[in-house]
Each structure stands twice: as C-alpha cells, then as structure tokens.
Amino acid sequence: MGKKVAIIGAGVSGLASIRSCLEEGLEPTCFEKSNDIGGLWKFSDHAEEGRASIYKSVFTNSSKEMMCFPDFPYPDDFPNFMHNSKIQEYLTAFAKEKSLLKYIQFKTFVSSVNKRPDFATTGQWDVTTERDGKRESAVFDAVMVCSGHHVYPNLPKESFPGLNHFKGKCFHSRDYKEPGVFKGKRVLVVGLGNSGCDIATELSHTAEQVVISSRSGSWVMSRVWDNGYPWDMVLITRFGTFLKNNLPTAISDWLYMKQMNARFKHENYGLMPLNGVLRKEPVFNDELPACILCGIVSVKPNVKKFTETSAIFEDGTTFEGIDCVIFATGYSYTYTFLDESIIKNRNNEIILFKGVFPPLLEKSTIAVIGFVQSLGAAIPTVDLQSRWAARVIKGTCTLPSMEDMMNDINEKMERKHKWYGKSETLQTDYIVYMDELSSFIGVKPNIPWLFLTDPKLAMEVYFGPCSPYQFRLVGPGKWPGARNAILTQWDRSLKPLQTRVVGRLQKPCFFFHWLKPFAIPILLIAVFLGLT
C-alpha cells in the first residue's frame, strides 16, 4: 500500500476521502467518534458533545440528482428532497458498495494532531486517539480533516443585553429535536437561517405564537421551482453561471433580484435582506411565506434587549410572555485537535487554498474537506475536494508556491466580500469552484469538444443541471455510466412523482428558462421599433 492517511470523521466528507484514498492507492484509516457513519445526517434523540446534531424533521435542500456521489445515483423511487433517514440509508449503501467500513475505527476520539519534529522534510503527523479510556499515538504521512463545521454552536449571549435576567428557557438550535414539548408555548427564534426557519414553521403548528428575529433578513426560496421542478435542477446550470458572471453588473443584479422575488415580494413579508444584491446563501423553506400570511409566524428585527419575560426589538415593539428563546445563530469554526498555527483564522476567515489546503506549511500533507458552502450540494463538492487532496498527497498533483497560494486566497476573498458580504467567508460560486477543482485533477468536461463529438450530451451538460455525473465523464476515476446518468437524470427526478399518471412526462427546456426574463423587454423594444 501507499502512504498512510488519517481521516478524521466518517460523515459524507470522511466517506468520500476514504474512497478517494483507495482510488489513489493510499492507505486510509478513518477515526469516527460515534458508533456509526453519517456525521451530520445521523439523527440522535439528544445532542452529543463534539458531534453535529440535527432535528428529527430535517429534509435536504438539494435534490437527489444534484447531491449524489457521481458514480452512485440514488434509487429511482427515492423522493427528490429526502428526509435525513433516507440520506443515512444512501450513505450506508454507498459505504457497503465501495467496501469502506473496514477502514473506519468507530468510537474513537482524535484528541490531537501534531507535526512530527522532522515535519519540514517528511511532512508526517503524530495523531493521538482515545478509545475505551486507552490513549494511542500513531504516525501518518498525511491527514484529511473531515469533522465538519456544524459542531460547536455559536451562542452570542453577550450580544443580547438582559438575557441573563430572562426567566424562560434559552438554548441553541442544535439542542432542538421535535415540537411536541412546545405545545401552547410562546417561542422566539433568533436567526433567519435554514434551521431557524425550519424550527419556526414546525413550531407554528403546536406553539401558541412564534416570532422570528432577524438582524439582516434573508432571501427565502422554495424547493419547488418553475413548473414544479426541483429548484437546483433549474437554476444550477453552466449557462446560468455564464450569464451571471458575464452580464453587466446592473443586469446581473436585476436578474438575481427578480429570481429571488419570483415567488413573493420579500419587502412585503419583512424578509428583505439589508443588502439585497449580495449573493448570500438563501434560506430554503416552503412553508414560511404561508405561515406569515396566516399569522402563525411573525418576523421582527434584531432584539435590542431582553427582560424577565419579554424581548424588545430595535423597532421598539415587544414580544411579551416568552416561554422559550431558541438561538439559531450558526456555528463556530474550530478544530480542537489542531494547533491554531496550522489552520489560521483571519477576521473570521479560515485561510485555506481553494478551501482545502493550509498555504503556509512546509509540506502540503493536511487537507480540510467540506469546509466550503455554496448553492450546490455538499456530496459532489467533497467528492472533488477529496479526489484532488488524495492526488496531492500521492504526489500526482502539485500545489503552487506559498506566495501564489496566498495571492489566490486574497484575490478570491475580495471577490467573496463583493458578492456575498464579509460574514459569508465560506461561500463560493458552485460551478466555478467545481470546475477549478476538476481542472486540477483532469476531469473537467470539455464543453466545446462535447458539442463537436456528442451534441446531445453537450446540450444537457451546458444548458441542463450541472449534476455530479459531469465530473466522472472523463479523466482519472472516469465512470462508464456517467453519460447515461446525465441523459436520464430527468427520468429519475420525475419517477417518484408518477404515483398517478395523467399524461406524458414533460421535461423542461432550460435555454428558454434563462431567456424568459428578457422576453418582455425584447417585446417592448420590438413594439417601439414597429411604431417608429
């Protein structure tokens, strides 16, 4: 076998990393704190220290055709947006199919990862683990950090004057599991992210009253998009990305605002982001607008201060008789087992080349997998990250110099601040990022060549959904079934809907979807020219 690689965590990122190491002839050992795979997607009735935690009703925000491993589609009958138990079922099937379980040491806690004294020449690491009260250390040639960034809750109590006097319950959203215990209660949810909106809408059916407090607002999107298709299969396309990144800023901003307000006017619902043209990651919630319309959820600005039983908001209004405050305020980015000098933090910005490699080490033998966010799905992202990292560790791919990596990081961060704002340092442009990683590995689809040699496939690749299968079409790790998977992705998407067949299946034409916003301006210009 090849170099020994320690993989920390057996969630989505960890499984992808084990598989990528095996593809490159490396020797992986995965350490998992719990007794099962799945990470974030493994539901537990109670939140465990040092592990990601989800509530019982969590569903995916990405559809199944956009969030699979590129050579392992979901079963045809799986719904497009899946309950967490379905994801766990899929990950278990993937791990068994790829024979990954034998490389995982369960119930093993990684307490420290340190450079060896000769790191500058060997790039090796001392990894210390604990299991059943026993402490062990081992030497590894490389480390892949796959422990996620939804572990340590951010609970900024000091930002809310008077909270220490509040007499009701107060906790972070990671401790929320199900709505039954809140029957008849008055609940304040602080934070307008995915968790905050999910919890608020779920509680609205059992609680007496639910209020969401938001400091800066958010775009709220539905999973169901034009003509009832999954949102990401309509919007995440290469053609759409080309338009977004090449149109004049004013037109691009107009298109973005029109897209975000397609379902309802955010201003009317008190949800409009403070800076609407920033491409901050939207919230996905199909119920929130209806809950606001029905009066069972209200949206308020930031909390100015708390009293013993109420919250006073920045607009002077008050929510009285609060029984419980749930802080859906995100997570802190930290790796307790690593020295701070290894993965540096600058103004809430983790310094990593392409979101994976610390740029200032003598040897690039540690990689962070899964530490980016985008409108795209996590599984195909970590698949590409881990494939690239494994090839760098093996020596097949090389990284630029420290100076070039830092210049790239600084340039990308300036662009991120422009597009997403300074608070969204993990955010990235999905297709642009995936194409960068795939070009490093040699698996990026050659679109012009596809149009010449396989126009049917090229049309689907460029104008259709940028699905994960595209990154197993060519190059290392090529999957023979990738072409067919792309051409049949709509069939699998529509299959679970056909429980009552009433006509021929209708597949969308996405070229016209992107031209639709320009139809009225073009028509008006034509009328004007005709009149003159």
UniProtKB/Swiss-Prot annotation:
It holds the Pfam family FMO-like. Disulfide bonds: none annotated. SUPFAM superfamilies: FAD/NAD(P)-binding domain. The modification Phosphoserine is found at S401. The keyword Transmembrane applies. The keyword Ligase does not apply. GO terms for molecular function: albendazole monooxygenase activity; flavin adenine dinucleotide binding; hypotaurine monooxygenase activity; N,N-dimethylaniline monooxygenase activity; NADP binding; trimethylamine monooxygenase activity. FAD binds at G9, A10, G11, V12, S13, E32, L40, W41, N61, S62. Keywords: Endoplasmic reticulum, FAD, Flavoprotein, Membrane, Microsome, Monooxygenase, NADP, Oxidoreductase, Phosphoprotein, Transmembrane, Transmembrane helix. It comes from the Eukaryota. InterPro entries: FAD/NAD-bd_sf, Flavin_mOase, Flavin_mOase-like, Flavin_mOase_3, FMO-like. Its EC number is 1.14.13.148, 1.14.13.32, 1.14.13.8. It catalyses: trimethylamine + NADPH + O2 = trimethylamine N-oxide + NADP(+) + H2O; N,N-dimethylaniline + NADPH + O2 + H(+) = N,N-dimethylaniline N-oxide + NADP(+) + H2O; hypotaurine + NADPH + O2 + H(+) = taurine + NADP(+) + H2O; (S)-nicotine + NADPH + O2 = trans-(S)-nicotine N(1')-oxide + NADP(+) + H2O. It is an enzyme of class 1 (oxidoreductase). Its cofactor is FAD. It is a single-pass membrane protein. The chain crosses the membrane at residues 510-530. NADP(+) binds at T60, N61, S195, G196, C197, D198. Belongs to the FMO family. PANTHER family: DIMETHYLANILINE MONOOXYGENASE. This is Flavin-containing monooxygenase 3. It comes from Macaca mulatta.
